Amino acid sequence: GTCGMFVIKLKEPSHKNFTPDFTARKSAFCFDNRIVCIGTGITNSESASNTETTLFQHAILSDDEAVEWNNTVSTDATINTTVQNADGMIFKDQTGNYYQVKEPLKVIVTKGLQTSVNNKTKAATEGKFASAYIDHGAAPSDASYEYLITIQPDDLEIVALKAEGYQPYDLLRKDDKAHIVYDRETGVTGYAFFEETTLDNDDYIVNATGEVMAMIGAP
C-alpha cells in the first residue's frame, strides 16, 4: 500500500491577530485512499468567534451543483444546515471524496456566497463555495475530533463505507501524548507521539523519548 502521515503540535504565537493560548494536537494518517484525521486538546480563550475544523471547502461552478450529507442530496442555491450530532454521518465534497465523522460532533454544511478580504491588499473578495466544518464552539477546552476521509472511492468502496459499522481501522490511542492508528487493510500502524510516552502492550514500541512520527508494517 501507499502510506504516510502528517502531524502538528499547534501553539499560536503572541502576535497581533493571533490567540497565544490556542493549542491543539492534530494528526492525519494516510493508508492507500483512506485518511484518518484526529485532533485532541483543542483549547483557546477566543470567545468572540467559534473555533472550527474544516472538513472541506470547494468552489461552486453552478448554483444547482449538488451537496450531499447524511443521505441528503440538495441542489439548492443556498444551504445552511446544522447537524447537532454527526456521529457516523457521511459528507461528500464536490470532487467525490467522502468524510465520515466518528464522534458526536456538531457539523455545519453551507453552500452559497462567501465574502472575505485579500490577505495583502485587504480588498473585498467573494465567491460561491460549498463547505462542511466541525463547530467546536467559542473558547473550547480540550475539544477533539475524529473523522475518516475516503478519497474518490469506487462503487464497491462506496457500498462498504455506507454500510453500518464500517470501520477500516482501529484507534489504539487518542490523547494529548499520542495518536496511534492501526489500519486493518494494510496492516500498518501509525504513531504520532507529541511528548515522552510509554506504551505497555504495543507490539513494536516500548517508549518514545519525545516527539516522534513512525509507521510500522506487519512483518
Give residue ranges: language-model regions:
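Extended repeat-based interaction scaffolds and adjacent low-complexity, acidic/S/T/P-biased segments
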Residues: G1-P219
